[in-house]
Amino acid sequence: MQSLFSNKYKFKDTEEKLNAYWDKIKLYKWKNLQGKQFIIDTPPPTISGQLHIGHVFSYCHTDFIARYQRMLGKDVLYPIGFDDNGLPTERLVEKIKKVRAADIDRKEFKALCNEVSAKFRMEFKILFQSLGISYDWDLEYHTISEEIQKLSQMSFIALYNMGKIYRKLQPIFWDCADRTAIARVEVEEKEMSSFMSTIAFSTEAGELINIATTRPELMPACVALFFNPLDIRYQHLQGQYAIVPIFGNKVPILSDEQVKIDKGTGLVMCCTFGDELDVYWWNKHNLNTQIIISKSGTLDLKHNIAETDTLSGKLHGVSIVEARKLVLETLSKCNLLIKKEEILHNVKCAERSGMPIEILLSNQWFIKVVEIKHELLEQVRKINWYPQSMRKQIEMWIDGLNWDWCISRQRYFGIPFPVWYSKRDNEEIIIPDVNELPIDPTETLPQGYSKEEVEADVDVMDTWATSSLSPQFNSIHTGINSIPLIPASLRAQSHEIIRSWAFYTILQAYYHHNSIPWENIMVSGWCLAADKSKMSKSKGNALIPNQLLQEYGADVIRYWAANSRLGSDTVFSDEVLQLGKRLVTKLWNASKFVSMFVSQCQIPDLNCVTETMDKWVLTKLYKVIVKATESFNVFEYCVALDYIESFFWKDFCDNYLELVKKRAYGESVTNKENLSAVNTLSFVLMALLKMLAPFMPYITEEIYSTLYNNGSIHDHDNWPVVNTSLCNEMDEQLGEDFIEILNQVRKIKANAQLSVKCKIYKLIINSENYDFPTSWENDLKAVCNAEHIVQDKRTSYYNDKFLISVQFAN
């Protein structure tokens, strides 16, 4: 008998061949089959540079589900988009083209962004195709395209008309490095070293009081001092005024419950603005406003300057860090610096630039969030979260929100606000008709207005304001409005964007459709570097997928990605890649063995299965199909793979292939026994290939097409059916007893340092009242290489069900 397979699996040849084949037959094309939809809201990767293996990690997770659902018979809508507008793309362009957006013409810079974006989109596409990600590329989109710009601007106008969007001068988070407003979600805390300085203030009455602060440079912006009303040390100061040292401004002393009695001196400055608590006090107590930080991150004290040689004159125009140093030096010279203590503390920084943020007053666009927190929590609880623990993250985020979503950005490459500001009397904001969209107000005029009568809004929208409409993108690109694409079946994403992408999408779906955006959300963890830190190109610990694909092939990379618990961070592991490589080799070799017999039964006939051990392996297979199906149905791909792989190695390869060889070859067995073996081999391998196909699409397709010649393994309705006729509990127990005896025989031979092929003259089985079927005995003789099996049915006084002894032929 001859195998249909070469000695070694050549993954590079196979992947190239199958990618062309799948593309030719449009395997992943969405067919719009009514009633069988499975719609995936796909995360559009940001065009910010090369993808590393950490990005590949989560994109594979989504693909496992897409392939499984397709094999279940679902019509899977699996689009791919690219998030190529906004600051990340700008930064990439500035780095590659060695330009600064602020230094060149806006149109010229946007053209460079489009050029670079197109190049990286193509690179991403090639990588995703190399990984076997089963996107429908006919549904590709990118967020700076005219179609998406139109949708985003339509969303803005709809929300504006609903009264859910407003423009206002109010405190916002400001990134001085990128010179733009940012949203609360783009702020992260970093531990930094600083100084806690205790400074001597005085009241108008001349009483000395001490303030502890990490930001002495904000003293010119001090508008009040606060103490806790329960703090008896300062109750007598209520209603008095304090003099800010070296600057001389007079500020009220007030009480508020938010002051921590045991922090610092218990008496704190309120400046406009040092932090969010300052904003809270400013609003609550209707305090004055004294803004001294410019948008470039320098001190702006021109209104405080009387003479150029004053301290204010020296501070004007210098950086925040330098100003802090100068103020402390001056306080020290004036004997007003009581104490200066080095500390480590958390500082709010911009997520993108990594620089400390400031809170400034600025006119920005906002989407209302705070007033509908309760409604948003209700929406969150209508969605199935996998894992369930991830829901708590977004609930805590919503509970803690006290700022609306700032959606305007002072950048260049983004979607413009479709807004002009009228200079005519009694007019403020001009909004175009939706039929005119997309528009750039800096390049066009509203109908009936001259350029002297309007001022264009030059800001662009927060990238999330567009990508949070991703469920709606599906409707645009399918051209289908007759079926509901919201809620989608699944959103798949990683955990660090729960507060941004997940939250904003829930918000947009609620406002626009009064619906949840998806029925289920599957949340992946991070792929961590060897030192358990997040992979990052800037840290130099990110692995490039193309190198690993060349070395291991796509199936091994996908296997590695599948070996991560849903929602859990996973350390990148060469060991897991080696396990994947070993699995590919073993699957190829096992299939090579089975291929010698499959020609007899290309379509396996289970009516031919008569032998006990064949029924045993079919029962084990049935239970694996049930468990894998149940796991996939709740998006636990890792658990499904664990069940499948355990069955493949332990039950199929280690035991069944060994015990069935003699019958498969037809050596000294009846035709019935032979047919039972080859039909079982063929059926079990086919089911294994199908269950492994979502994880390892290339090798499973290659083996399946070679052996069974029955279309693609990834076709609809190709997932193994849960067939109860496969299950026979009695035969399963007989099989388990068989394996127990076999393992004891193997152990005896190993202890005697004999080959597993060493011939046994007599295999003696001590058991209590046990009758073995003839087919069972024949298989046991074959696999143990035993000439005779003798049963000793005396009453057993051993703990084990069987006591095995052997007499070797020699």
UniProtKB/Swiss-Prot annotation:
Biological process according to GO: valyl-tRNA aminoacylation
Matching CDD domains: Anticodon_Ia_Val
Stretches of the chain forming a coiled coil according to its record: none
Main location class: cytoplasm
GO cellular-component term (any): cytosol
Entry's family note: Belongs to the class-I aminoacyl-tRNA synthetase family. ValS type 2 subfamily.
Domain notes: ValRS has two distinct active sites: one for aminoacylation and one for editing. The misactivated threonine is translocated from the active site to the editing site.
Protein name: Valine--tRNA ligase
Source lineage: Bacteria, Pseudomonadati, Pseudomonadota, Alphaproteobacteria, Rickettsiales
